[in-house]
């Protein structure tokens, strides 16, 4: 019996972490996610909108006008082609273009954030399947050991070496091991279902990782990387810059603007390319705004309020990211320390089990002592599997936070 447990310990001791196919799993999750596809097209829609609104101020307005009489009859004797172009507007056009560019970049950062969130969930789903698989193996082995104990107790009871109470205790332990195995099977099924829904395929070909996890930088380097690479912080920066450009765009509405208007009338002969530039009526208009229903004043005031809000939002984001990075980095260290502590506890439980088995054979300890010691070893093994899973998740959570993994 002890050899079986030692063999199990050797098998599980070879598992260093769950990360061999994480990159492939992340790619499949992103590729198969309907949510990501939806957000991709949402981003593309925003891209079209911001690009068109940013460029619109630089482009002319061209129209062809027809006249109708009171009976809605088309007057074919006269048509008018008009071109209007804003030449100078106090920098409003450039500010609007820059604002649209910053808003588009912020939208892109949010889309990348969605991919990071999905990637981390994919890591969790991958690790969960592996964790639940190993837990089930432990529960199945515990059930076999409990059955072996029960059989041994029955034989010893028939020989008068143990009491009926010890046999009943072994039966209770066996029944408990069955319920734990059934519970582990149910949790593994749920983990497989969650994996399928997220990744888009069954978790049949997963294997434990033998390669090392991506390296984790020191805390100061993580903080520096987060300040330059964190997607939430980048989005806040672009939002702040866009708000500043909006103030310039609204303020420019108070400044004079110079507009060009060119028009040409066409008779019944219609439009001819070779005569298109003849008799063109060109007008330059200098527009000096004085009062436009108060819209300009309120527009500037609102833009300034939005700029202040974006600035304070940026400061709050900086503080939050710093706290989150420190917390994530500490979680990595804590998970690593827990693994080491549980490994030591596992070794101690293995040695304790060996000693208790010898004492039971010498009738120095009871069967209940042996079963309790075995439970301690199984618990240490289960805790170790969970600790390694938590370590993998904490590492990827930190790496996504400092944006050191390209998606």
Predicted ranges, named:
Residues 176-201, 346-404:
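Short segments within alpha-helical structural elements
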Residues 81-85, 195, 284-288:
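Residues on the lipid-exposed face of transmembrane beta-strands in outer-membrane beta-barrel proteins
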Residues 76-78, 124, 169, 279-281:
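Transmembrane beta-barrel architecture of outer-membrane proteins
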Residues 4-13:
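Sec-dependent N-terminal signal peptides
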Residues 12, 18-61, 87, 163, ...:
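Bacterial Sec-pathway N-terminal export signals of envelope proteins
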Residues 101, 164-175, 301-304, 367-378:
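Short, charged, amphipathic alpha-helical segments
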Residues 20, 115-228, 328-331, 335-339, ...:
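Periplasmic alpha-helical coiled-coil/stalk elements that build and connect Gram-negative outer-membrane
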Residues 37, 60-76, 86-113, 234, ...:
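Small/polar (Gly/Ser/Thr/Ala-rich) solvent-exposed segments
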């Amino acid at each position: 019996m002890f050899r079986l447990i030692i063999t199990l310990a050797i098998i599980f001791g070879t598992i260093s972490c769950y990360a061999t196919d994480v990159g492939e799993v992340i790619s499949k999750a992103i590729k198969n996610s309907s949510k990501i596809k939806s957000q991709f097209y949402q981003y593309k829609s925003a891209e079209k909108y911001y690009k068109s609104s940013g460029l619109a101020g630089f482009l002319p307005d061209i129209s062809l006008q027809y006249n109708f009489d009171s009976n809605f009859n088309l007057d074919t004797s006269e048509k008018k082609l008009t071109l209007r172009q804003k030449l100078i507007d106090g920098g409003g056009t450039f500010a609007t273009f820059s604002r649209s560019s910053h808003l588009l970049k912020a939208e892109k950062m949010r889309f990348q954030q969605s991919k990071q969130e999905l990637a981390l969930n994919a890591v969790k789903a991958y690790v969960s399947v592996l964790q639940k698989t190993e837990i089930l193996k432990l529960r199945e082995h515990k059930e076999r050991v409990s059955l072996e104990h029960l059989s041994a107790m029955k034989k010893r009871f028939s020989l008068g070496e143990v009491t009926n109470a010890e046999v009943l205790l072994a039966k209770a332990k066996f029944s408990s091991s069955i319920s734990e195995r059934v519970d582990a099977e149910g949790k593994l099924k749920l983990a497989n279902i969650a994996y399928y829904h997220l990744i888009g395929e069954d978790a049949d070909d997963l294997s434990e990782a033998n390669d090392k996890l991506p390296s984790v930088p020191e805390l100061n380097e993580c903080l520096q990387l987060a300040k330059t690479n964190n997607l939430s912080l980048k989005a806040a920066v672009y939002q702040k810059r866009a708000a500043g450009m909006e103030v310039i765009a609204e303020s420019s509405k108070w400044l004079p603007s110079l507009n060009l208007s060119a028009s040409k009338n066409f008779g019944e002969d219609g439009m001819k390319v070779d005569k298109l530039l003849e008799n063109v009526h060109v007008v330059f208009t200098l527009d000096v705004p004085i009062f436009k229903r108060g819209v300009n004043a309120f527009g500037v005031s609102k833009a300034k309020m939005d700029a202040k809000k974006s600035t304070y939002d940026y400061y709050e984001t900086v503080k939050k990211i710093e706290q989150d990075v420190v917390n994530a980095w500490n979680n990595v260290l804590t998970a690593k320390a827990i693994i080491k502590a549980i490994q030591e506890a596992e070794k101690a439980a293995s040695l304790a089990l060996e000693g208790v088995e010898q004492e039971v054979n010498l009738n120095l300890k009871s069967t209940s002592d042996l079963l309790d010691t075995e439970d301690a070893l199984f618990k240490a093994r289960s805790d170790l599997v969970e600790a390694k899973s938590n370590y993998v998740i904490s590492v990827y959570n930190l790496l996504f936070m400092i944006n050191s993994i390209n998606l």
